[in-house]
């Protein structure tokens, strides 16, 4: 795949040679199987995604606020090896892999959506908005394929990739407010808006709005993630994370309103100046097999929850920086999360520049606990 | 490479509190109404009581009650309440399902509800079932009334209304109190006090919601007192008890929803008891539903109710006359739920983000800094020429 790129042994990151990620010593492996991915960007990582295709050697891509996009591949030494990098002249707000993992869509804060072809290592602008592009998702439907982008310009746009390099817009949906988060699990798409409403779309035969749900959360929505039903076949609902340290689990077609609920998370254990501090929930991911979810927050912890049993499975120890984004591999074996400053305390709060990427083996941690009777 | 400003390590830290994160939040723990006795939390290893022990103890008690003579029937309910106290002491936390099953086993005995339908001590039984029904308190109390248990006990309706209010169904809470009046529950003062307290708390909630929306300018318009807006989907309005309305006995009581009428029919009409029974309970599906209702996880967020002093209610259901909020008091050894004479001292919470981010996302803020964002020092990306590639 990368043979034609001509990189060879050329240095990729910061002038240093390509090196494998650092594995923790054996003494720590028995206690903690986490390991760091070498070559994390120098600025906050906004998005991190595993490649969608289940492979023997999964790939990992991340986009950061300094416009850096990097791709790693899991090598034979069981570490992630840096493979490619691109520099975009704007913060990266979202990325989306194409289904065969050969290309990456990039949502940028400079109002453009780009396509990075990994084989040729070239980038093209494939869509534009009137405001920063907040989300991008590749829709691989039964009858069509397109790129869905959501923006702060209050529009949701769908782009055709067949006529490149021409930008072909297939559809545009005018929204009442800015797009803050979105997720796609065909045939369902959910879009969270700044007015705390969630638009639900049916993507079969084109996007069709099927529901407009008011969020159960009182504060700004920060992330959203779709989950499947108990048979793990079809999308059934979504989980919302807010800046108030609370997550809402919402079913789209709810038979019993009591199935929808919210729970608190990512709050300080001790009092700080007499107050319990509430942190933002920065990202939510569902385990593809178990159906459990992991939340990451500005408090530097990740927590794993079983939404069906409404119990918490695990909480990590606090990390020295906020956790900004996470993803679970399609095999369910790995959880990747990024550390970095998330701007929650403004520009002056950025006291620790840089970022870290940690891989955590999660197949056992996120397994639902058996019910005792 | 430059030296890292801090030493990052993935070594596991000693954080004992992490294991109990779930229990730290008061909404995730449903305490008993009167708190937990401190002795019950200081368990010795040899005194550990298991689920099987509790089941066996109840079976023995029920067998013993079967052999009681008729003259000792008044002791039967007291022994059951003693068993409940024992259970709450020995199996304080984490046995809500077992407790509900055992309580259901008690009330489902033949003739039990009919025998004690006027005994106010049954209020404790219903309260315990409601508290351990995984958030289905409304159904439990409704079932009690449908079986004509404590139909005329005003304290039951007050407790029922309070539990519904805790679930956030304020309109339904009002309906419960209306049902109390329709059923001629006594003493009426309890119903009046509960109603006043409910409206007071409702006003306080509205004021707090208004205070939290400081940036919004609400245009207030005055409306005629008789043109109050409806609340919720039903055509009901807030209860306003004018002196003239209270003394007027000729007007009919407000009607309920059809669903409520079908399930809970009043036994009193025009302030007089009906000459014959008008309610016949034949829906067996309800019984089967309630038998296993504790398996349905209806997670309802609870928050403290700062009740006004109401000795009538507390006196009917508890031996203590304290009318304050029950809240957790943490210490270095264990966490004890207790009733304090002073007001609650629960720590306040605040969001650890800048105020501007309540309305503006982090990414919007970063995008607004462009092109002067400190991260933007890179060159423009190269454009792709597909024609050249082909």
Swiss-Prot record, chain A:
Residues modified as N-acetylmethionine are: 1
- Taxonomy, superkingdom: Eukaryota
Q: Where are the transmembrane segments?
A: none
Q: Does the keyword Repeat apply?
A: yes
Name the Gene Ontology biological process terms. Answer: mRNA transport; protein transport; RNA export from nucleus; transcription-dependent tethering of RNA polymerase II gene DNA at nuclear periphery
Instruction: Spell out the residue ranges that the record assigns to WD repeats.
Output: 40-82, 87-126, 128-169, 276-315
The entry's note on the tissues where this protein occurs is: Expressed along the ventral and dorsal nerve cords.
* InterPro entries, sorted: G-protein_beta_WD-40_rep (IPR020472), WD40/YVTN_repeat-like_dom_sf (IPR015943), WD40_repeat_CS (IPR019775), WD40_repeat_dom_sf (IPR036322), WD40_rpt (IPR001680)
Which key words are in the record? Acetylation, Cell projection, mRNA transport, Nuclear pore complex, Nucleus, Protein transport, Repeat, Synapse, Translocation, Transport, WD repeat
Entry's localization field = Nucleus, Nuclear pore complex; Nucleus; Cell projection, Axon; Synapse
Query: Can you provide one Gene Ontology molecular function annotated for this UniProt record?
Result: RNA binding
Instruction: Give start-end of the signal peptide.
Output: none
A GO cellular component annotation in the UniProt record = axon
Indicate yes or no for the key word Nucleus.
yes
The record's note on quaternary structure and interaction partners says: The nuclear pore complex (NPC) constitutes the exclusive means of nucleocytoplasmic transport. NPCs allow the passive diffusion of ions and small molecules and the active, nuclear transport receptor-mediated bidirectional transport of macromolecules such as proteins, RNAs, ribonucleoparticles (RNPs), and ribosomal subunits across the nuclear envelope. Interacts with rpm-1.
- Which family does the record claim for this protein? Belongs to the WD repeat rae1 family.
Function noted in UniProt: Functions as a component of the nuclear pore complex (NPC). NPC components, collectively referred to as nucleoporins (NUPs), can play the role of both NPC structural components and of docking or interaction partners for transiently associated nuclear transport factors. It is specifically important for nuclear mRNA export. Has a role in neuronal development, where it acts downstream of rpm-1 to control axon termination and synapse formation in anterior lateral microtubule (ALM) and posterior lateral microtubule (PLM) mechanosensory neurons.
**Name by which UniProt lists this protein:** mRNA export factor rae-1
């Amino acid at each position: 795949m990368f043979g034609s790129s001509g990189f060879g042994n050329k240095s990729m990151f910061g002038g240093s040679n390509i090196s494998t990620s650092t594995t923790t010593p054996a003494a720590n492996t028995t206690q903690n199987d986490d390991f760091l991915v070498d070559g994390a960007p120098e600025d906050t990582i906004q998005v991190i995604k595993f490649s969608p295709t289940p492979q023997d050697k999964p790939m990992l891509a991340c986009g950061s606020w300094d416009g850096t996009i990097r791709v790693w591949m899991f090598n034979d030494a069981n570490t992630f090896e840096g493979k490619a990098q691109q520099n975009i002249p704007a913060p990266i707000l979202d990325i989306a892999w194409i289904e065969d993992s050969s290309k990456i869509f990039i949502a940028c804060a400079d109002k453009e959506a780009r396509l990075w072809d990994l084989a040729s290592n070239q980038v093209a602008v494939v869509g534009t908005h009137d405001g920063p592009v907040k989300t991008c998702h590749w829709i691989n439907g039964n009858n069509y394929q397109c790129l869905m982008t959501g923006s702060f310009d209050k529009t949701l746009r769908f782009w055709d990739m067949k006529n490149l390099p021409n930008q072909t817009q297939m559809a545009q949906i005018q929204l009442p407010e800015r797009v803050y988060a979105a997720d796609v699990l065909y045939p369902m798409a959910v879009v969270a808006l700044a007015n705390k409403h969630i638009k639900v779309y049916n993507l079969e035969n084109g996007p069709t709005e099927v529901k407009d749900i008011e969020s159960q959360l009182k504060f700004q929505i920060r992330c959203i993630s779709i989950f499947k039903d108990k048979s793990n076949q079809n999308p059934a609902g979504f989980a919302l994370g807010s800046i108030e340290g609370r997550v809402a689990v919402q079913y789209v077609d709810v038979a019993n309103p009591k199935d929808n609920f919210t729970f608190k998370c990512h709050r300080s254990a001790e009092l700080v100046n007499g107050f319990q501090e509430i942190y933002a929930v920065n990202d939510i991911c569902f385990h593809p097999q178990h159906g459990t979810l992991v939340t990451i927050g500005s408090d530097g912890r990740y927590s794993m929850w079983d939404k069906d049993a409404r119990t918490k499975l695990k909480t990590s120890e606090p990390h020295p920086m906020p956790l900004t984004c996470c993803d679970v591999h399609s095999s369910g074996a790995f959880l990747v999360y990024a550390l970095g400053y998330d701007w929650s305390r403004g520009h002056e709060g950025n006291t620790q520049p840089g970022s870290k990427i940690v891989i955590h083996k999660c197949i056992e941690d996120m397994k639902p606990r058996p019910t005792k009777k | 490479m430059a030296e890292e400003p801090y030493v990052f390590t993935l070594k596991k830290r000693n954080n004992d509190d992490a294991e109990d994160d779930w229990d730290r939040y008061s909404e995730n723990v449903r305490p008993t109404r009167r708190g937990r006795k401190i002795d019950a939390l200081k368990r010795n290893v040899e005194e550990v009581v298991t689920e099987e022990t509790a089941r066996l103890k109840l079976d023995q008690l029920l067998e013993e009650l079967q052999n009681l003579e008729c003259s000792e029937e008044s002791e039967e309910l007291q022994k059951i309440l003693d068993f409940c106290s024992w259970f709450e002491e020995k199996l304080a936390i984490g046995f809500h399902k077992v407790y509900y099953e055992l309580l259901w086993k008690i009330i489902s005995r033949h003739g039990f509800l009919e025998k004690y339908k006027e005994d106010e001590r049954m209020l404790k039984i219903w309260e315990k079932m409601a508290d351990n029904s995984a958030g289905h308190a409304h159904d439990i109390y409704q079932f009690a009334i449908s079986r004509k248990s404590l139909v005329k006990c005003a304290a039951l309706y007050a407790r029922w209304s309070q539990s519904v209010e805790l679930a956030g169904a304020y309109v339904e809470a009002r309906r419960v109190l209306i049902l109390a009046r329709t059923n001629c529950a006594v003493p009426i003062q309890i119903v009046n006090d509960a109603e006043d307290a409910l409206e007071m708390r409702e006003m306080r909630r509205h004021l707090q919601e208004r205070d939290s929306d400081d940036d919004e300018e609400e245009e207030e318009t005055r409306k005629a007192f008789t043109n109050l807006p409806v609340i919720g989907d039903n055509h009901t309005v807030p209860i306003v008890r004018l002196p003239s309305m209270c003394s007027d006995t000729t007007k009919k009581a407000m009607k309920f929803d059809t669903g409520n009428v079908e399930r809970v029919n009043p036994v009193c009409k025009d302030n007089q008891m009906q000459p014959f029974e008008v309610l016949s309970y034949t829906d067996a599906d309800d019984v089967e539903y309630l038998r296993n209702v504790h398996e349905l996880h209806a997670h309802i967020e609870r928050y403290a109710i700062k009740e006004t002093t109401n000795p009538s209610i507390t006196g009917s259901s508890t031996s203590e006359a304290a009318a304050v909020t029950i809240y957790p008091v943490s210490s270095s050894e264990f966490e004890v739920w207790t009733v304090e004479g002073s007001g609650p001292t629960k720590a306040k919470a605040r969001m650890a983000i800048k105020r501007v981010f309540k309305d503006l996302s982090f990414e919007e803020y970063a995008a607004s800094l462009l092109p002067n964002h400190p991260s933007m020092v890179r060159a423009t990306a190269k454009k792709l020429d597909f024609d050249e590639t082909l």
